[in-house]
């Protein structure tokens, strides 16, 4: 069994990104700029935002975190986003989710300039993605594809099961696997006989948001298991959707939590911010 080390791969890719950024600054005078807007004081969101800021600075980017109270009105938040849309120094805009109940997530995602939507969640970018002309790709699935590439995991002709159907992970993950010529099935919380279905898959990507949901009864010997889940157990420990100790006994490759998919998500956000900066100069 091989552990897919997303943290180490992220460090490797971000070192290469820092070199590209330095060359971009030297040759064209461009510095990628990433702004992250954090609404409220959700502890998990604060951790994610700190990690994004740290990665942006390490890559040589201009970075800013805008913290606003969770009492901010929807219109004021939309106005704030528009200010960064109009500022050419910023090439990537992220609004950390989740948002307070009085703010429409849909309106916020629509407000971000598609050219600066490095999360790839604006309908314009989604449309380009689904039509086979991607510009911004949702970062978690993009990071998983980089893992497959780094570890030389063959996808063509393989049977892949994606457990989870979100617009952020499940659906785009299935599309990227299809594009790589895998045969893909999407399952979810209402899928019947899920363990039986999962045992037929060569590759299982789990993004269902339930701690330790997938046990070794779901996984055939030698399968590749990618765990996107980030949950807390009763003691506050970070755990994935996969029961790692069990499943690692039968999987050929597996991602840990933490240190698997999470660091790669942030790495791909940085890559897409760099690419947005390059496109802005054309």
Swiss-Prot record:
Biochemical pathway: One-carbon metabolism; tetrahydrofolate interconversion
Catalytic activity annotation: (6R)-5,10-methylene-5,6,7,8-tetrahydrofolate + NADP(+) = (6R)-5,10-methenyltetrahydrofolate + NADPH; (6R)-5,10-methenyltetrahydrofolate + H2O = (6R)-10-formyltetrahydrofolate + H(+)
EC number: 1.5.1.5, 3.5.4.9
Entries under HAMAP family matching the protein: THF_DHG_CYH
Function: Catalyzes the oxidation of 5,10-methylenetetrahydrofolate to 5,10-methenyltetrahydrofolate and then the hydrolysis of 5,10-methenyltetrahydrofolate to 10-formyltetrahydrofolate.
UniProt keyword terms in alphabetical order: Amino-acid biosynthesis, Histidine biosynthesis, Hydrolase, Methionine biosynthesis, Multifunctional enzyme, NADP, One-carbon metabolism, Oxidoreductase, Purine biosynthesis
Complex formation: Homodimer.
Name of the protein described by the UniProt record: Bifunctional protein FolD
Top-level taxon: Bacteria
Family under the similarity heading: Belongs to the tetrahydrofolate dehydrogenase/cyclohydrolase family.
One Pfam family named in its UniProt record: THF_DHG_CYH
InterPro entries cross-referenced by the UniProt entry: Aminoacid_DH-like_N_sf, NAD(P)-bd_dom_sf, THF_DH/CycHdrlase, THF_DH/CycHdrlase_cat_dom, THF_DH/CycHdrlase_CS, THF_DH/CycHdrlase_NAD-bd_dom
Source organism of this protein record: Streptococcus suis (strain 98HAH33)
GO cellular component: cytosol
GO biological process, one term: purine nucleotide biosynthetic process
GO molecular function annotation: methenyltetrahydrofolate cyclohydrolase activity; methylenetetrahydrofolate dehydrogenase (NADP+) activity
Sequence positions that bind NADP(+): 164-166, 189
Ranges annotated as spanning the membrane: none
């Amino acid at each position: 069994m091989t552990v897919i080390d997303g943290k180490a791969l992220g460090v490797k890719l971000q070192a290469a990104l820092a070199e590209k950024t330095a060359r971009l600054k030297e040759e064209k005078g461009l510095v990628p700029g990433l702004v992250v807007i954090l609404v409220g004081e959700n502890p998990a969101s604060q951790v994610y935002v700190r990690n994004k800021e740290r990665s942006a600075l390490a890559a040589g980017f201009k970075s800013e975190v805008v913290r606003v109270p969770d009492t901010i009105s929807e219109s004021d938040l939309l106005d704030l986003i528009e200010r960064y849309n109009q500022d050419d120094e910023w090439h990537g805009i992220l609004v950390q989710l989740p948002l307070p109940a009085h703010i429409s997530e849909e309106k916020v995602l629509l407000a971000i300039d598609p050219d600066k939507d490095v999360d790839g969640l604006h309908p314009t970018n989604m449309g380009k993605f689904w039509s086979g002309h991607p510009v911004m790709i949702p970062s978690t699935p993009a990071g998983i594809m980089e893992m497959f590439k780094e570890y030389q995991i063959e996808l063509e002709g393989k049977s892949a099961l994606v457990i989870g159907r979100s617009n952020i992970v499940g659906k785009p993950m299935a599309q990227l696997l299809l594009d790589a010529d895998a045969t893909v099935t999407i399952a979810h919380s209402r899928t019947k006989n899920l363990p039986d279905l999962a045992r037929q898959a060569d590759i299982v990507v789990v993004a269902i948001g339930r701690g330790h949901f997938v046990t070794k009864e779901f996984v055939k010997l030698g399968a590749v298991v990618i765990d996107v889940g980030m949950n807390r157990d009763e003691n506050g420990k970070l755990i994935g959707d996969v029961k790692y100790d069990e499943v690692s006994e039968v999987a050929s490759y597996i991602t840990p939590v933490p240190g698997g998919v999470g660091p790669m998500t942030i790495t791909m956000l940085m890559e897409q911010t760099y690419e947005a900066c390059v496109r802005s100069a054309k």
